[in-house]
Design a protein with these regions (language model features):
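AMP-forming adenylation/ATP pyrophosphatase catalytic core
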Residues: 151-343
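ATP-dependent adenylation/nucleotidyltransferase module used to activate substrates
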Residues: 1-194, 324, 331-333, 341-343
């Protein structure tokens, strides 16, 4: 009995990566999938914070279960962060280093392929779907830089790309692959209906914080104020929590937006000052940096602004660190003051 070739797939949990698995299998290969945890995924963030108002799921696990594919989760967050801070190919519209990200993941998939004796790597990329990383010239450059020339199958667009080694040697039936291109999703959605795939996440990069303008602004703020040299994965994670306010180059505050974020901030405060309103329901805030003089009142006024006492003439805010507590009475901040300091 002839042994089927083995393909290593990158499974994000999105529509295209899900389809790439099924199409590759139908074209004659066994598949094994990898899902990389980078620290910048929205669904992973919601799970860690404890969000209950949004669906919390790892779509890659759901898709793998639905299509019957083996899946290995790989934490690459510590290696991934330095690449994000200094991408060789630069950023997209926000802080998203899409080309460098692709090369990063494909190199690790190549290493896995070589360790396991697999025949090729495959992805759900579609020609022309993304303006920077999925035009034909970029696809070729990424494949070369990742060390996968001739061994990277893109089954959804294979018919409009040069045949890979697996196709040329008959390991994969090229006639069972597709020639999708462009930003339209209808062909993929129709194909998903045909295969009965329903567990995939929504398209358009919605899982990556780095494509989000608000998150990217906070990321740039940390880098601008000297944080890149000592930035950790946990620091990056906190950028997705709460409202962030800058008071000086060395002082900022994070104010929770809901009960889950308040609980999370209270847990992560550690050696930082935390703050909350006295006598009213309100947010938990964590202060990063040392508070000086007028900073107490300014921070307290913003915390008060987001409390149930925001319409009072003045309210008390309590700051706590370890066994030390300090109370400050202040008027809630004006909208203009909030706008000046919000990152």
């Amino acid at each position: 009995m002839k042994t089927r070739p083995l393909g290593i797939g990158l499974l994000s949990g999105g529509l295209d990566s899900a389809l790439s698995c099924v199409v590759t299998r139908e074209a004659g290969a066994d598949i094994r999938c990898l899902h990389f945890f980078t620290g910048f995924c929205v669904t992973g963030h919601n799970s860690r914070v404890g969000r209950t108002d949004r669906p919390i799921a790892n779509h890659a696990l759901q898709v793998a279960a639905e299509i019957g594919a083996s899946l290995e989760l790989v934490d690459v967050s510590e290696e991934y962060l330095p690449m994000v801070l200094k991408p060789k190919h630069g950023y997209g519209r926000n802080m998203n280093p899409c080309i460098d990200c692709r090369v990063f993941m494909l190199r690790r998939a190549r290493d896995y392929m070589e360790r396991t004796g697999a025949d090729f790597v495959f992805t759900g990329e579609v020609v022309g779907q993304r303006p920077k990383s999925q035009v034909k010239t970029a696809l070729r450059a990424i494949e070369k830089e990742a060390g996968l020339e001739g061994r990277l199958l893109r089954p959804l667009s294979a018919r409009i790309l040069p045949p890979t080694v697996a196709e040329r040697t008959g390991l994969i039936d090229r006639e069972k692959l597709h020639g999708f291109s462009g930003r339209g999703r209808k062909p993929q959605i129709d194909l998903a209906h045909r295969y009965g795939i329903t567990a995939y996440s929504q398209p358009a990069g919605g899982c990556c914080f780095l494509t989000d303008s608000s998150y990217s602004t906070k990321f740039k703020d940390v880098i601008a104020h000297g944080g890149s040299g000592s930035l950790s994965v946990d620091d990056v994670f906190v950028l997705g929590v709460g409202r962030h306010f800058r008071f000086s180059p060395v002082l900022k505050a994070i104010v929770g937006r809901n009960a889950e974020e308040n609980d999370f901030l209270a847990r992560m405060a550690g050696d930082h000052w935390s703050a909350g309103v006295v006598g009213f329901n309100g947010p938990t805030a964590v202060v990063v940096g040392e508070i000086r003089d007028d900073d107490w009142v300014e921070i307290a006024s913003i915390v008060a602004r987001y409390s149930d006492g925001k319409n009072k003439e003045s309210i008390e805010v309590e700051f706590v660190r370890g066994g030390t507590a300090k109370r400050v009475r202040t008027a809630p901040a004006s909208a203009d003051f909030v706008a000046i300091h919000r990152i």
